Amino acid sequence: MLDGHERTLLAAQGYSELSMYDDAIAELDTLPAEAVKHATVIELRAVILMQAKRWKSALTAARALCRTEPEKTSGFIHTAFCLHELGRTAEARDVLIAGPEALHIEPTFHYNLACYECALGNLALARLHLDKSFQLDKKFRDFARSDPDLAALRE
């Protein structure tokens, strides 16, 4: 379904890396309808919109990814992140918890849940998820040192 469209996808990624988000989206918009519905394209659109901090549009794309590939964990992580950025943190937490079982072995799942629980005032639960993210991937310890969403755990 994406055969012959690799150049367009690479161009969109390139524009995105240069922070030329409108151009990146414009590239994706040149794809035919059947390609636009492909999970790879939907996810790329969501990521570009997230980089551009266009949270409502990114949320729409991320939710489409969840519908298109309900077992793909990144759709749920992206959806939850957008909801959190829109100030809908409890909903973000609920989306992650309701996602596919495969999420539970991903450090990003636990790290983001820690951020959401911290924002919601559930510090003990936040600490549990944060520690689990560290167990799964030590690099999250570095992220946590400066993440404003986790400030309450550092106090």
Which residues does each predicted region cover?
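Alpha-helical segment of the N-proximal tetratricopeptide repeat
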Residues: 3-34, 44-51
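TPR/TPR-like (Sel1-like) alpha-helical repeat modules
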Residues: 118-119, 123-142
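Alpha-helical adaptor scaffolds
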Residues: 40-108, 116
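A conserved position within tetratricopeptide repeats
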Residues: 32-33, 63-67, 100-101, 134, ...
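"A position-specific structural signal for the A-helix of alpha-solenoid helical repeats
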Residues: 10, 44, 78, 112, ...
